[in-house]
């Protein structure tokens, strides 16, 4: 259903379940109307920014950027283009700078990973980091940089553990691989030091860093407060909260919550997600992809997967946008169509059945090589029959799943990042 807005609102596969597990993303290889006379002014929708296309396995960064951009756009009315490349740069830096043995960069991560990166390094707009890609749907710079760093790890400077223990040398290799110009390098030097002796989370960093690097505490956001049922204009740091990779705290801090196993708890979980969407709150979802479940109509379907058998698999993170639900009386509230406040209240009944959740993806807007039709370009419908599973889980070999060797099973829906006040007492 369409959640109507007032005019002022303009993964390599996971090895185990858990909110803190790193996701290595799997990019693709190449009519019910509102009731007459009913007001819809108090129903909201998520005002997403444009769809992008990942070129490497960092979907978790793209999903997080979409989440950040949506929170910011609700506050400012302006579409910010946050740099996924900037966070990717620092994710690689932290892997390389510890000097441990490695032959290639891991592109996987999680919500906890991105929250920590933002704590330490803030964010930049794409125009201020890789200006040449400020209007691009897909970053070729990321894939080129990944190839360059992996080659350096195999045959170049980064092959030497001593170099990897020298933070200034690691940064120099990254700057070269990313093709950063002197102005951008100078900005990073000024804020963090050439050897990254400073980060934004240190107690002595009290002033705004400027130099186009933005702290979370200075980046505008709007969050729905479920304790007061009001929209609050706050800062991104309020949504992130404080804490470590393992947990975040704060009165408005979002939390990563695992999808439960029992039918009753799953319905409670789904209702929490529905409430978030009703309140125009973006929700990040982590799930397992099997590309043989993807239909030409841009849906992930258990029926399609059963017909075709297991295919290439991996972890994935996306941001929710909408959903379709059958009410207890059999009426269907369709995704993309108007719904009144009364109907949405009925959609939260435990007897209502969600048919699918629609997500904003990071695989590009128009992909005739992957799907021929989509309700919204760049968005996918995840049918509950698929999300609930179970589906066959295939063994990974040489970095790829083997569809001929699938001894286990898994529930595709892993977790969601829910706003404060929701997700408590869901059960298991």
Residue ranges and their predicted role:
Residues 1-12:
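Bacterial N-terminal signal peptides that target proteins for export
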Residues 18-19, 53:
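Processing junctions and N-termini across compartments
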Residues 23-25:
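N-terminal Sec signal peptide cleavage junction
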Residues 37-238, 243, 271-279, 283, ...:
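Active-site nucleophile-adjacent alpha helix/oxyanion-hole segment immediately C-terminal to the catalytic cysteine
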Residues 158-161, 258-358:
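Active-site-adjacent substructure of cysteine-protease-like catalytic cores
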Residues 231-260, 304-308:
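Mixed-charge, low-complexity intrinsically disordered regions
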Residues 335-428:
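Conserved catalytic-core surface of thiol
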């Amino acid at each position: 259903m369409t959640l109507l807005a007032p005019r002022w609102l303009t993964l390599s596969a996971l090895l185990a379940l858990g909110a803190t597990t790193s996701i290595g993303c799997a990019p693709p290889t190449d009519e019910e109307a509102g009731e007459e006379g009913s007001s819809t002014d108090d129903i909201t929708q998520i005002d997403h920014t444009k769809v992008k296309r990942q070129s490497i396995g960092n979907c978790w960064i793209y999903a997080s950027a979409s989440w950040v951009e949506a929170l910011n756009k609700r506050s400012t009315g302006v579409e910010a283009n946050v740099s996924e490349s900037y966070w990717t740069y620092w994710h690689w830096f932290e892997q390389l700078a510890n000097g441990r043995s490695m032959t290639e960069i891991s592109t996987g991560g999680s919500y906890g990973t991105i929250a920590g990166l933002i704590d330490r390094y803030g964010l930049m707009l794409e125009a201020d980091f890789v200006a040449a890609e400020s209007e691009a749907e897909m970053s070729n710079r990321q894939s080129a940089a990944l190839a360059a760093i992996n080659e350096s790890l195999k045959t170049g400077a980064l092959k030497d553990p001593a170099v990897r223990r020298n933070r200034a040398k690691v940064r120099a290799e990254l700057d070269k691989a990313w093709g950063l110009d002197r102005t951008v390098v100078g900005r990073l030097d000024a804020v963090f030091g050439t050897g990254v002796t400073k980060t934004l989370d240190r107690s002595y960093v009290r002033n705004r860093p400027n130099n186009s690097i933005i702290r979370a505490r200075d980046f505008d956001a709007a969050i729905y407060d479920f304790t007061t049922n009001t929209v609050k204009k706050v800062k991104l740091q309020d949504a992130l909260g404080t804490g470590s990779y393992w947990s975040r705290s704060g009165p408005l801090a979002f939390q990563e919550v695992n999808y439960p196993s029992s039918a009753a708890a799953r319905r409670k979980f789904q209702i929490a997600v529905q409430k978030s969407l009703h309140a125009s709150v973006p929700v990040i979802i982590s799930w397992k992809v099997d590309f043989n479940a993807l239909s030409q109509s841009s849906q992930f379907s258990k029926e399609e997967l059963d017909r075709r058998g297991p295919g290439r698999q991996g972890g994935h993170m996306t941001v929710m946008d909408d959903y379709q639900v059958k009410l207890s009386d059999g009426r269907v509230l369709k995704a993309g169509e108007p719904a009144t406040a009364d109907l949405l209240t009925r959609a939260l009944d435990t007897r209502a059945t969600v048919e699918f959740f629609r997500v904003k993806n990071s695989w590009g807007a128009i992909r005739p090589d992957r799907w021929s039709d989509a309700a919204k370009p760049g968005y996918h419908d995840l049918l509950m029959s698929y999300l609930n599973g179970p589906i066959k889980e295939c063994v990974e070999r040489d970095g790829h799943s083997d569809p001929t060797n699938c001894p286990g099973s898994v529930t595709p829906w892993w977790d969601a990042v829910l706003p404060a006040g929701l997700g408590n007492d869901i059960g298991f």
